[in-house]
C-alpha cells in the first residue's frame, strides 16, 4: 500500500478538529455580534480555523486528503442539522421553559445550514485547489503567501455565497455587503495572525509524518472521494 494512502494520527486529529469547528461555526452563525462599528456573525470565532486546517492538510497530504476531509465536514454538519430538526419535531416536556430559545437556534439552522454548507463546499474546495496548484507551481516555496492567497480566494467565494443565501431579505443590502467584506478581511487577518503557528505545525507534521505531497497528475474532480 502506498504511504499517501495511509491515515496517520496527525491527519485524524486535524480532521476531527476540522469537523468540530464546522459544526460549531454552523450553530454560531445564527447570532450576529457587534465588533466596534461593524457587525459580524459569531461564527467568525471559530470558522477561520477550518481554513487554516484545510491549508495544513492540503500542504502536507495534498488535495486528495483535503477533499476527503471537506466531504466529511459536510456530512457531519448535515448530520447535526438533521438531528436538530428531529429534536424540534419531538414534543417538549410541559414543564420545560427553553423551547422557544432552542427552536430559535435550531429552527434557523436549516436556512443557515443550507447557505453554510453550499458556501463551505465551494470555498473550501477553492482554498484547497489554489493551495495545491500554487505549491506545485512554486515547487513548495512561499508557504505563507500561498496560505494567505488561498484563504482570500476561498473566503471570498464563501462569503459571496453564504451571506445572500443566509441573510438575504433579513437586513438592508448595504449592511449585507458590509458584513461580507468585513468577514473576508477579518478571516484573512485571522489567518495572518495565526500564520507563525501554522508554519510551525506544518513543518512539525511534515517531519513527524514524513509526508510532503505534491499534487502532480491528479484529478481535481471534487466527487472522486475514493481517490485518497
Question: Which residue stretches match the model-derived regions?
Answer:
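Alpha-helical transmembrane segments and their lipid-water interface positions
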Residues: 29, 33, 80-88, 123, ...
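Short aromatic-rich membrane-water interface segments that cap or initiate transmembrane helices
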Residues: 41, 45, 101-115, 182-183
Amino acid at each position: 500500500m502506498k504511504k499517501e494512502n495511509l491515515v496517520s494520527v496527525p491527519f485524524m486529529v486535524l480532521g476531527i478538529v476540522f469537523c468540530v469547528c464546522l459544526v460549531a461555526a454552523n450553530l454560531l452563525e445564527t447570532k450576529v455580534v457587534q465588533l466596534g462599528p461593524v457587525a459580524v456573525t459569531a461564527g467568525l470565532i471559530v470558522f477561520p480555523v477550518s481554513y487554516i486546517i484545510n491549508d495544513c492538510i492540503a500542504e502536507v497530504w495534498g488535495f486528495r486528503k483535503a477533499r476527503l476531509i471537506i466531504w466529511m465536514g459536510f456530512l457531519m454538519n448535515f448530520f447535526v442539522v438533521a438531528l436538530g430538526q428531529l429534536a424540534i419535531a419531538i414534543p417538549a416536556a410541559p414543564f420545560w421553559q427553553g423551547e422557544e430559545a432552542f427552536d430559535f437556534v435550531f429552527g434557523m439552522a436549516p436556512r443557515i445550514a443550507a447557505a453554510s454548507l453550499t458556501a463551505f463546499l465551494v470555498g473550501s474546495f477553492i482554498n484547497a485547489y489554489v493551495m495545491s496548484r500554487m505549491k506545485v507551481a512554486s515547487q513548495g516555496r512561499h508557504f505563507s503567501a500561498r496560505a494567505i492567497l488561498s484563504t482570500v480566494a476561498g473566503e471570498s467565494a464563501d462569503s459571496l455565497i453564504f451571506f445572500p443565501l443566509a441573510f438575504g431579505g433579513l437586513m438592508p443590502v448595504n449592511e449585507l455587503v458590509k458584513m461580507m467584506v468585513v468577514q473576508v478581511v477579518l478571516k484573512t487577518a485571522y489567518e495572518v495572525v495565526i500564520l507563525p503557528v501554522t508554519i510551525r505545525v506544518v513543518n512539525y507534521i511534515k517531519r513527524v509524518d514524513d509526508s510532503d505531497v505534491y499534487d502532480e497528475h491528479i484529478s481535481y474532480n471534487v466527487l472522486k472521494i475514493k481517490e485518497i
